[in-house]
Each structure stands twice: as C-alpha cells, then as structure tokens.
C-alpha cells in the first residue's frame, strides 16, 4: 500500500537514480496539459508548475496536495462561519402583486398568469417557491389553505395546496387541482389582479429558519463535530451518547489510515497558525526555544486533565479544544467587525470580561508560534493528543530506506518535529503531511502500510541520544501525570462549587436548552449559537455565574428579543446542549417568564399610559399580554369617573414563552430613549416553573397541557 501524494524532488534520469513519479498519471497529464508545465528531467529544468509552487514556498513545492486541502478546509470553515451563520440577509417573504390570469384550463385545473404590473424582484422570488397562496384582490379571498386549515392556526404554517407547475420570465403556471370544485369555479371567473405569496394569511413567520436551512448545504457545525475531544469529553461529562460521537468515530477511523491527518490537513486552527507563523513568527525569532524541553508532552497531560474533569461532570474541553478555540476567537475578534460594517456599529453588543479572556486566549495560541512554529499544535493541543494516542493503532506510517544520505532537509521542513536526529519517525507526532518526502533528494522516504516491507536505514545513525525511559524521565512523567490528575479534580471541585453558589440567580438560556446542570456539561462554549442569532439576543456570559458558566449563552433581553421566525441556535449546536427544534416546536419552547414590576410600570404605577409591551407581544403572535383597566377613580355615588385610570398590561403566563421582545421594547423606549425608567418595567426571569427544560418530548404538547389547566 502506497500513500505517496507529495511532489518528489527534481532528479535527473541518470542510471541508478530512482524516480518516484507515478508514470501513468504523469503520462496522462503530459498528454492533456501543456508540456511547459512539466519539468525536464534530462536537462534538470523546472516546469512552470513547479516554479509557481517554489515561489509559493518550500512546503507548497514539497506537498502541494496538503496545502490545497488545508486551503480548501480553511475556506470552507470561514464560509460556514461567516456566511452560512449570517442571518441578517433573511427577510420576510414579500407578496407579489399584479398578476393577471391569461389562460385557464378548467379540465386540467391549471392557470397561466402574466406579471403585468408585478415587481421584477418579487416575480423572480415567487418563481423559486414550490407552492403559493392566491389572493383575489377584487373579492379579498385567499385560496390555497389545505382542508381543515384556519388562518392563524398552526396548520397554516404548512405549504399551500396550489403548486407552481412552471415558471418563466414574467409568467407562472399554477396547478389548482388540489382545490375544491367551488374554489376552482370562483378563480376561473376572476379577471384579477391576483396577489401571490409563499405564506398564507396569519401563518407563523419563518424567514430566518428558512434562510439558514437554504444555506446549510453542509452542517454549519461540521468542524466542531469532527473534533473528537469535543464529542468524547461531552459524552463523558453528560453521561450521555451525544450524536456527534458518530462523526468523531468517523474522523478517528480515517486517521488510522492517515495518522493525525486532522491536524495536518483539516484543522482550520492549524492552518491559521501556519499563516500567523508565516506572516509574523518568521520575522521575530528572538523568543525561540529548543525543540526538547518539559513542554513537549503538555498536550497529553492536558488531555488527561480534561478527561478527568469530564469524569467528575465538568466540561473543560470547550476552553482548550482546537475548533472551539478558533470559532470563539473569530466570534469575538472578526465577527464584530463583520456585523459593524454590514449593519452599523451600534448593532455590536458591548464586551464583558468573557470577551476579553477569550481574545487573550486566542492571541496566546497564535503567539506561541513565536517560541517555535506551530508550538500549539506540536506541544499543547489536547485535540491533537487524541490523534497521537490513536496513532498507536495506525495502519500506515512514514519509513526511510537505506539510500538516505543524512542531508537533514526532512528535519528542517517537518512542521511537527516528528523526525528524529537519525531521520526515523516519532510516530506519535507524524501527521503524514509528506513535506519531508518532497524535499528528499534521494527519494528515500516512503509512506506505506505499517506492515509493508521497506529496506529500512540503520536506526540510531547518526546517534539520536534518545534512550529508554530512565529515572529522570520516569520522574517527569510521574509529576506530569500527577499534576494532570490533580488539576482535573481540583478544577472540577472549584467549578462545581462556584456553580452551586450561583444557582440562585439562573440566567435565561436559549429556547430548547436542556436542564441547567446538563446544559453546563454539554455546552462547549464554541459560540456558534451567538453567530447564528439574528438579533444578538444570545450573548456570552462572563464570570458572574462562575467559571463553569463562562462563555455559555444567555438571553440579554435588554439588547434584543428572540425572533419568532428563528430556530438557528439549536440547528448549529454541535452537542445537543440546545435541542434542534423545528419552528413549529420552538415557538412553544418556554425559556423564561415575563414579570411585571408593579411599582415602575408606567400605567400600573399610575404615571402615564403605555402599551409598548402589549403591542410588541401581539405583533410577535404570542398574545401573552392583554389590557386591564387600573387606577379608575370613583365618584361620590360609586360610579367610575370617565377618563380616569389607565389600560395596563396583564400577563397570561400560560401563553408567555419568555422571548424578551416586551422587555426589549420597554428598555429601548422608556429607559434608553425617554429615560423615564432606570430599568425595564417588564423583565424575563428563569427558574423553577418559569421555563421548560427537557431532553426530549414536545414543547407543543406541554404548552397545550399548560393552557388546559
């Protein structure tokens, strides 16, 4: 089994010189591509392709396949993070008006429409839908609701019964066969104009959910679910088989064939570190440290500490795993710039202590490259340590044959210090990046099956001065292991202690969150839910609830409310800490309960009329606030004085889901703009009896039982 995909060093065709080119592939390339792209081995002249790779850098020239895969993975990661999880372009579906029925085929129940006065953009948009609702402007009747549907009821959230059969430039053909005979008769005699809409009258808005669904051709959390430490530690901490374990098992299986392939090819943090080392690290070498030192095994001790803490029910992997580190780092550094430039800087939430700590951690990970290139990946990353342990079961490996001339080029180019001084391999560190194979002048390096026979070079030549584990090494390993064990246990005790003290004032969590103790054991603090939230109502916590809640999402209703058409946070959560709810379930998921302050609410306190919260709740479709008359004065005869008192808000707790839109409106107008209040008079509070936190089951059914009581 051969796994060579590096570009071999240019070598002449003299007798005795072995060539490593795959003859058939090269011959096919020569026949299909211009000859000047290929090197001339007889004259030892580089082709244009090799010249371009050399210009890009020595690693590009040695292992172009690896660099291409790295680039593609980084670009994919950035697209998923900055485009797929970018909800601000979603808009409610606008109806398209001005359609005139041109041809009506009664037998086939089809009609062809002409867009005589319809807006061009709306015409193009309506042509992309599969079903439409038709409103006859003259009679103001809407057609398309399926049998039994009632406008405004849950059933109207579905598709229309009228199907778009064909769409052309300015024309539409509609299939009306699912309508009743009476409805077809009414439409057949209508002269128009008709209004077309993809949503029915009174249907629940879903533009944010639809936008994410359309963009998510690949799961937005893909790179998070293939980080094995994330899944393993979450499963251990929560004592549950999280669904992302299957993806982790898949990537570990692939890495049996390509040892540590995740680190060498796929990891976007590693590629970002490569870019930092190229742009900054190579210019500042005053801080360089030796390749050997106490730090070379930090990643194993860190992995042990993370797993010990997970066994104690505390999740630490979110703080140090590779993919959560980069997603959170980009979330707090680049994402605010994206939001500010696109939507205005007033739309960027303020920072707290959690933001500062995360940015410092991310910059520290990059800054370690000043000590040695890819210092984090080689010595610190616990996600990489998982793959190093898996290397014990590798099916392939790097081998060096007896033609090695000890030129040291492979040692110089290796990004992971995986080559010993005798040019053999440190198998726990090798990522099969194959850069060494591309610079070997004698083509002595092979990437083959572990059991494949190769005439290997003599080991310990030149001497490596590496010996079996002695007393000093044993003592160092014992100290490191003991420190990892103690650190994991003490971290768990400290974090659990802080959590119990902070349990009195629970934060409001996203809709669909599992019970709080399990939520803290499953949330990896990756920040994907913040990025997918269209109104930034979800914001990271600082240290107000202790270290265990650091960077976990909380609802900040003073800033914004939870959009009724969005379910993005659950869709992008990689571990199930937030359940992936369909919009029909999410609209009933209670994340808190609105509480009115009787002393500060303007009408309840008898100060002035105000209906902001009621209007906002009604517009959102929850109808959990209604008016009651308060403060009415009584004359001497016991009759109410006309014009006295106020219409005040009254909460229907069985309908409130804690979306926070009422609090946002009150804060924005009465606190921020008019400054008649110090804080919102209606706030969302979590806690027992105020929120629904379930691992499974229907929120819709639970809401039905609550309303029946």
Residue spans of the language-model regions?
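Non-ligating segments of multi-cofactor redox enzymes
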Residues: 2-144, 148-152, 157, 163-165, ...
């Amino acid at each position: 089994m051969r796994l060579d995909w590096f570009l071999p060093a240019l070598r002449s065709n003299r007798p005795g010189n072995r060539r490593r080119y795959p003859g058939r592939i090269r011959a096919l390339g020569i026949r299909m591509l211009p000859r000047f792209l290929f090197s001339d081995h007889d004259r030892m002249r580089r082709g244009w392709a090799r010249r371009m790779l050399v210009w890009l850098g020595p690693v590009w020239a040695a292992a172009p396949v690896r660099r291409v895969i790295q680039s593609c993975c980084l670009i994919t990661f950035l697209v998923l993070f900055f485009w797929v999880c970018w909800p601000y372009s979603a808009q409610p579906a606008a109806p398209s008006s001005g359609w005139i029925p041109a041809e009506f085929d009664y037998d086939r129940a089809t009609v062809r429409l002409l867009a005589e006065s319809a807006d061009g953009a709306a015409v193009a948009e309506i042509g992309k839908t599969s079903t439409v609702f038709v409103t006859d402007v003259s009679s103001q009747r809407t057609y398309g609701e399926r049998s039994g549907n009632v406008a405004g009821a849950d059933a109207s959230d579905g598709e229309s019964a009228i199907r778009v059969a064909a769409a052309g430039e300015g024309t539409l053909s509609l299939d009306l066969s699912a309508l009743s005979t009476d409805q077809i008769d009414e439409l057949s005699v209508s002269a128009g104009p008709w209004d077309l809409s993809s949503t029915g009258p009174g249907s629940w808005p879903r533009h944010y959910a639809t936008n994410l669904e359309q963009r998510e051709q690949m799961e937005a959390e893909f790179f998070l679910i293939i980080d094995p430490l994330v899944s393993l530690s979450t499963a251990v901490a929560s004592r549950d088989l999280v669904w992302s374990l299957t993806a982790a098992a898949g990537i570990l299986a692939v890495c049996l064939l390509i040892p540590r392939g995740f680190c060498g090819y796929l990891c976007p943090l590693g590629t970002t570190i490569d870019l930092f080392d190229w742009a900054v690290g190579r210019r500042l070498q005053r801080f360089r440290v030796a390749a050997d030192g106490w730090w070379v095994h930090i990643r194993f001790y860190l992995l042990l500490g993370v797993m010990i803490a997970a066994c104690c029910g505390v999740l630490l992997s979110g703080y140090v795993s590779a993919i959560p580190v980069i997603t959170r780092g980009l979330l707090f550094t680049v994402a605010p710039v994206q939001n500010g430039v696109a939507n205005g800087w007033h739309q960027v939430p303020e920072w707290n202590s959690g933001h500062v700590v995360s940015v410092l951690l991310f910059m520290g990970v990059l800054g370690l490259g000043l000590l040695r290139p890819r210092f984090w990946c080689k010595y610190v990353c616990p996600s990489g340590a998982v793959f190093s342990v898996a290397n014990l079961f590798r099916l392939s490996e790097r081998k060096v044959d007896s033609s090695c001339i000890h030129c040291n080029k492979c040692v110089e180019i290796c990004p992971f210090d995986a080559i010993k001084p005798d040019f053999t391999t440190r198998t726990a560190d090798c990522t099969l990046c194959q850069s060494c194979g591309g610079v070997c002048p004698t083509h002595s390096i092979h990437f083959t099956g572990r059991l494949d026979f190769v005439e290997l070079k003599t080991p310990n030549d030149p001497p490596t001065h590496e010996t079996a584990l002695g007393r000093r090494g044993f003592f160092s390993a014992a100290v490191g292991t003991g420190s990892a064990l103690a650190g994991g246990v003490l971290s768990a005790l400290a974090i659990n202690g802080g959590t119990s003290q902070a349990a009195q004032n629970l934060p409001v969590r996203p809709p669909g969150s599992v019970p709080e103790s399990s939520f803290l054991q499953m949330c990896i603090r990756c920040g994907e839910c913040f990025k997918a939230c269209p109104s930034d109502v979800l914001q990271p916590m600082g240290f107000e609830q202790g270290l265990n809640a650091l960077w976990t999402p909380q609802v900040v209703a003073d800033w914004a409310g939870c959009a009724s058409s969005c379910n993005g946070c659950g869709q992008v959560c990689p571990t199930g800490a937030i359940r992936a709810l369909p919009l029909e379930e999410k609209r009933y998921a209670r994340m808190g309960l609105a509480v009115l302050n009787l002393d500060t609410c303007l009408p309840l306190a008898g100060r002035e009329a105000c209906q902001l919260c009621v209007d906002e709740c009604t517009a959102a479709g929850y109808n959990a606030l209604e008016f009651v008359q308060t403060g009415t004065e009584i004359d001497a005869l016991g009759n109410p004085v006309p014009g006295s008192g106020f219409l005040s808000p009254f909460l229907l707790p069985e309908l409130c889901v804690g979306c926070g839109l009422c609090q946002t409106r009150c804060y924005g107008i009465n606190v921020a703009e008019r400054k008649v209040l110090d804080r919102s008079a209606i706030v969302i509070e979590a806690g027992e009896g105020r929120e629904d936190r379930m691992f499974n089951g229907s929120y819709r059914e639970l809401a039905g039982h609550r309303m029946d009581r």
